[in-house]
């Protein structure tokens, strides 16, 4: 069987020049958000399927790359539904893993906790032009602070970062879902 040279649809190889730019940006992100007191954390790329799935189904359900159970847990002959076959999936964003992380580790973290995450995420939907199934995401959150000051700090830290990256004349829109 011949080796397929191109990556799977929606994935891409990253060449050295792009990696150099990416590393520069990631270092600037760590440095800038670190100066605002954000701590870098890392969560696994694989999460329990129950954490990734919402009870209502919906759009997020379609984003999950699901992972089959392995070994003795995988019983193909008696499976009646998808839940009998799948127990985990690749994260489609960094928010769900952060919720699990904070729930598991909050007793060992300062309050409020300022989290910085950068990592690959995967989306199982069919990618549109210019979009990918695997991509790097950056996320900052302040947990345990109920005032609007946390929201203001997120905006200030991000505008500082964008300025350091030489972005100008940008607009920040605030959404409340």
Can you name each region flagged by the protein language model?
Residues 1-177:
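TRNA-recognition modules of translation machinery and tRNA-sensing kinases, especially anticodon-binding
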């Amino acid at each position: 069987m011949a080796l397929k040279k191109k990556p799977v649809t929606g994935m891409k190889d990253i060449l050295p020049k792009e990696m150099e730019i990416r590393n520069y940006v990631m270092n600037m992100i760590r440095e800038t958000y670190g100066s605002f007191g954000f701590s870098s954390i890392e969560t696994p790329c694989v999460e329990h399927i129950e954490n990734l799935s919402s009870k209502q189904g919906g759009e997020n359900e379609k984003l999950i790359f699901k992972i089959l159970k392995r070994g003795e847990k995988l019983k193909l002959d008696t499976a009646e539904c998808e839940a009998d076959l799948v127990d985990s999936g690749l994260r489609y964003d960094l928010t769900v893993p952060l919720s699990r992380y904070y729930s598991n580790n909050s007793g060992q973290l300062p309050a409020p906790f300022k989290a910085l995450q950068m990592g690959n995420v995967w989306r199982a939907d069919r990618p549109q032009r210019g979009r990918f199934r695997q991509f790097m995401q950056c996320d900052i959150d302040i947990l345990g602070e109920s005032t609007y000051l946390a929201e203001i700090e997120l905006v200030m830290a991000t505008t500082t970062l964008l300025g350091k990256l030489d972005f100008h004349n940008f607009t920040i829109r605030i959404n409340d879902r």
